[in-house]
């Protein structure tokens, strides 16, 4: 679902921001 998709994408976004 949406939550699992966010859980997958969020760490990558955080890496990009960092």
UniProtKB/Swiss-Prot annotation:
Tissue specificity remark: Expressed by the venom gland.
Key words of the record: Amidation, Antibiotic, Antimicrobial, Fungicide, Immunity, Innate immunity, Membrane, Secreted, Target cell membrane, Target membrane
A single Gene Ontology CC term: extracellular region
Subcellular location: Secreted; Target cell membrane
An example Gene Ontology biological process: defense response to fungus
Residue numbers bearing the Lysine amide modification: 18
UniProt keyword Magnesium present: no
Domain of life: Eukaryota
Principal location listed in the UniProt entry: secreted
Cleavable signal peptide: none
Other remarks on this protein: Several analogs have been synthesized to study the effect on cationicity, hydrophobicity, alpha-helicity, amphipathicity, antibacterial, antifungal and hemolytic activities.
Family recorded in the similarity comment: Belongs to the xylopin-like family.
Protein's job: Short linear cationic amphipathic alpha-helical antimicrobial peptide (AMP) with potent activity against Gram-positive bacteria, moderate to low activity against Gram-negative bacteria, and low activity against the yeast C.albicans. Has been tested on M.luteus (MIC=1.7 uM), B.subtilis (MIC=2.5 uM), S.aureus (MIC=3.7 uM), E.coli (MIC=3.7 uM), P.aeruginosa (MIC=31.7 uM), and the yeast C.albicans (MIC=25 uM). Also has noticeable hemolytic activity (LC(50)=105 uM on human erythrocytes), indicating it cannot be considered for therapeutic applications.
Protein name: Codesane
Organism lineage string: Eukaryota, Metazoa, Ecdysozoa, Arthropoda, Hexapoda
